[in-house]
Curated annotation (Swiss-Prot):
Organism: Solanum lycopersicum (Tomato)
Phylogenetic lineage: Eukaryota, Viridiplantae, Streptophyta, Embryophyta, Tracheophyta
First-tier enzyme category under EC: transferase
Protein name: UDP-glycosyltransferase 73C4
GO CC, alphabetical: cytoplasm; nucleus
UniProt GO MF annotations: UDP-glucosyltransferase activity
Length: 344
């Protein structure tokens, strides 16, 4: 989680105004932030205030551990959210070391390919496929390793990608039997053969995002994925699912202004995907793809901001960069603290 989302949730946990908001769909302004950020209760779910006993117990344990901690290590970098890093330090009254993006520690192509897990597809096949497309033309779609959509929403997403007529890579970690049947019955993969590549299972995300042909990233807004997209310098379509991901969406869209919302309005809880059904239609998916890949001034400015952030991310991890300095400072601080706490 980044400092922006950590501060969002910190400010909401004890905010009395949250209880006064009767509707789960009413937008309200998050208090105590530098930017105007609006969310709904449906988007927060259990993130700000646990709605059941299991989440409440876990939240209390996390709060206790945080209070006892000497400081916090955060996978982010100063140029990304400087005001929110300082705001979180003041709110928590804790030291914070920002040492990211940690994905940049994987410098070799093989390391990037194997980051997180073993890929379900040969990396050379992916790269050769990407090589066949123009620079900044391909949409990379990946909703994370834990996220699941209803069968109807998966179908709408597939149809939206197809109707956009834009080249895409679609990574699908989880498929219902109904969706597998739909792929076969509709001959979907054959239909999009000249346009899209479907990857079943784990994909080398960091490696693929760094390819020059990638022009945008449709993401679930998990923090690691969000930061990997930022580091790659690409614009994003935000499709948050649960936890703090709606906060991450607001950072990308409203603060950094490098992304476009897909239109998701409520969290998808585990096991309730089919009950929730479809949130975004194929037509709306097509529209948002056109918006993020737009070659007019708005789209160009969005891509320019994204590219500049990607360059700043890389500089942060260099020897003279802020994250490199903070990592050195972390080692020194922990060493000094250990000396103080060492029994005589």
């Amino acid at each position: 989680m980044g400092c922006f989302s950590l501060l969002c949730l910190h400010n909401l946990k004890d905010w009395e105004g949250l209880e006064k908001i009767e509707s789960d769909t009413e937008y309200f302004r998050v208090p105590g932030l530098f930017d105007k950020i609006e969310l709904t209760k449906n988007q927060l779910g259990n993130a700000a205030r646990p709605r059941n006993e299991e989440w409440r117990v876990m939240s209390e344990k996390m709060k206790k551990a945080e209070e006892e901690a000497y400081g916090m290590v955060v996978n982010t970098f100063e140029d990304l959210e400087k005001e929110y890093i300082e705001g979180l330090m003041n709110a928590k009254n804790k030291k914070i070391w920002t040492i990211g993006p940690v994905s940049l520690c994987n410098k070799e192509k093989q390391d990037k390919a194997e980051r997180g897990n073993e890929a379900a597809i040969d990396e050379h096949k992916c790269l050769n496929w990407l090589d066949s497309w123009e620079q900044n033309s391909v949409l990379f779609v990946c909703l994370g390793s834990l996220s699941r959509l209803s069968t109807s929403q998966m179908v709408e997403l597939g149809l939206g990608l197809e109707s956009s007529r834009r080249p895409f890579i679609w990574v699908v970690r989880h498929m219902s039997d109904e969706f597998k049947n739909w792929l076969v019955e509709e001959d979907f993969e054959e239909r999009v053969k000249g346009q899209g590549l479907l990857i079943r299972g784990w994909a080398p995300q960091v490696l693929l995002l760094s390819h020059p042909s990638i022009g945008a990233f449709l993401t679930h807004c998990g923090w690691n994925s969000s930061l990997e997209g930022i580091t790659a310098g690409v614009a994003m379509i935000t499709w948050p699912m649960f936890a703090e991901q709606f906060c991450n969406e607001r950072l990308i869209v409203d603060v950094l202004k490098t992304g476009v919302r897909s239109g998701i309005e409520r969290q998808v809880m585990f096991g309730e995907e089919e009950k929730l059904g479809t949130q975004v239609s194929k037509d709306d998916i097509k529209k948002v793809i056109e918006q993020v890949m737009d070659e007019e001034m708005e789209g160009e400015m969005r891509r320019k901001r994204a590219k500049e952030l990607g360059e700043k991310a890389k500089r942060a991890m260099e020897e003279e960069g802020s994250s490199h300095f903070n990592l050195t400072q972390l080692i020194q601080d922990v060493t000094e603290q250990a000396k103080i706490l060492k029994p005589m």
